Amino acid sequence: MTKKKRENLGVALEIDGLEEKLSQCRRDLEAVNSRLHSRELSPEARRSLEKEKNSLMNKASNYEKELKFLRQENRKNMLLSVAIFILLTLVYAYWTM
């Protein structure tokens, strides 16, 4: 996802969307694996399914990498929010004493 698009969406919403895409990708991968193992296929059909399987595995891997990055970004944002809250609390406590 491009940086500009990432700025327009909340990180949590992006994570939710990406998790859904990853889930769908895994379901599709299971379906392809099932078709590969359950039927007697022609060599051409088998190659096609193997290609689709590799494509889905690459897509799932990319989604997992992106999720890892987004979760790290989300963690940094949360820590920054907590730090700002603590700082404001300390300033308020100092000011009111």
UniProtKB/Swiss-Prot annotation:
Q: Name one Pfam family in it.
A: CCDC-167
Record's keyword terms, sorted: Coiled coil, Membrane, Transmembrane, Transmembrane helix
Any GO CC annotation of this UniProt entry: membrane
Where does the record place it?
Answer: Membrane
InterPro entries reported in the protein's UniProt record: CCDC-167
Q: Which residues form a coiled coil?
A: 10-79
Q: Which residues cross the membrane?
A: 78-95
Q: Tell me if Phosphoprotein is a UniProt keyword of this record.
A: no
Q: How would you describe this protein's topology in the membrane?
A: Single-pass membrane protein
Q: Under what name is this protein listed?
A: Coiled-coil domain-containing protein 167
